[in-house]
Regions:
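Glycine/Thr-rich phosphate-binding loops of Rossmann-like dinucleotide-binding domains
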Residues: 13, 81-82, 106, 190-191, ...
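Short amphipathic alpha-helical segments
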Residues: 17, 61-62, 83-86, 108-110, ...
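Cap/insert and terminal regions of metallo-dependent hydrolase folds
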Residues: 166-252
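Conserved beta-strand hairpin/beta-sheet module of binuclear metal-dependent hydrolase folds
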Residues: 1-62, 144-161, 180
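Short beta->alpha connector loops
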Residues: 53-56, 78, 101-102, 138-143, ...
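Active-site neighborhood of phospho(di)ester-bond hydrolases with catalytic His/Asp-centered motifs
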Residues: 49-53, 69-77, 97-99, 157-163, ...
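Active-site metal-binding motif and surrounding structural segment of the metallo-beta-lactamase
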Residues: 44-98, 177-180
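Metallo-beta-lactamase
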Residues: 93-146, 152-153, 235-238, 244
């Protein structure tokens, strides 16, 4: 199994349009960026997406993904679902898994496109391409939102999705002891109503007993990537994690 971070940015991405802060200027000058959040899960020749970002067309083209087996949506904010429209006239009847309430919220925007709704309840496991997934509630007010637990061949990966640090105990129990925790962390510090900061995300990783932590959904509040990576385990676009032979292997995008 392979997991790739297709986008590690927050809703406006980095660099932000019309922003001339140090981080955005560094991104323009040096040619790096943070596309909007999406994760690619690969098993054999099958591809599964966790969220469909506004940058999805580019993300799929640049990673030679011609067809996806399924999509999982974590919540109804545009930076996590709006790229699904890229499947229009490209791939019909994509299977989409999420909770009934999230399906209802996103479905209002997707009436031009036919897809197969797969409604799953929180804490109810389901399989796609021999990988087991479980959705669990997180805290991203005011919308309903879920994180994703991924299990394959004894490995466990947890994606927090967008959430603040106030996650309920039942969800925390579901998240325990992951081999890899992909945690949202919009800024290095500060208090945010909808998101964790890096320090909160790192504390969550320690509490869960995560073997490895990578931070995603990162805003331009961080210093430029090279400097930020010396302070925190910040993810980068197209970073890959391979699971096999009892080990986790990590590779970075170009």
């Amino acid at each position: 199994m392979m997991i790739k971070l297709l986008g590690t940015g927050d809703s406006p991405g980095t660099p932000i349009l019309n922003c001339h802060c140090k981080t955005c200027e560094d991104a323009r000058r040096k040619g790096w960026e943070r596309k909007r959040f999406s994760i690619l899960v690969k098993n054999g020749d099958k591809f599964i997406l966790i969220d469909t970002s506004p940058d999805l067309r580019r993300q799929l083209l640049e990673n030679n993904v011609e067809r996806v087996e399924a999509v999982i949506w974590t919540h109804s904010h545009f930076d996590h679902f709006s790229g699904f429209g890229e499947f229009y006239r490209v791939q019909e009847n994509v299977e989409v898994y999420t909770t009934p309430s999230i399906h209802e919220s996103i479905g209002k925007f997707m009436q031009f496109l036919s897809y197969r709704k797969r409604e799953v309840e929180e804490f109810q496991s389901f399989k796609i391409s021999d990988i087991e997934f479980t959705l669990f509630p997180v805290n991203h007010p005011p919308v309903d939102a879920v994180g994703v637990k991924i299990e394959w061949n004894g490995f466990k990966v947890v994606v927090t999705g967008d959430t603040n640090s106030e996650i309920d105990e039942k969800s925390l129990s579901e998240m325990e002891k992951p081999d890899l925790l992909i945690a949202n962390a919009i800024a290095p510090s500060g208090k945010f109503r909808k998101h964790m900061n890096a320090k909160e995300a790192m504390l969550l990783g320690e509490r869960l007993g995560a073997k490895k932590i990578v931070l995603s959904h990162l805003g331009h509040f961080y210093p430029p990537h090279k400097s930020a990576s010396k302070l925190f385990p910040v993810g980068e676009d197209y970073q890959e994690f391979y699971f096999g032979e009892g080990k986790l292997y990590e590779f970075f995008g170009d």
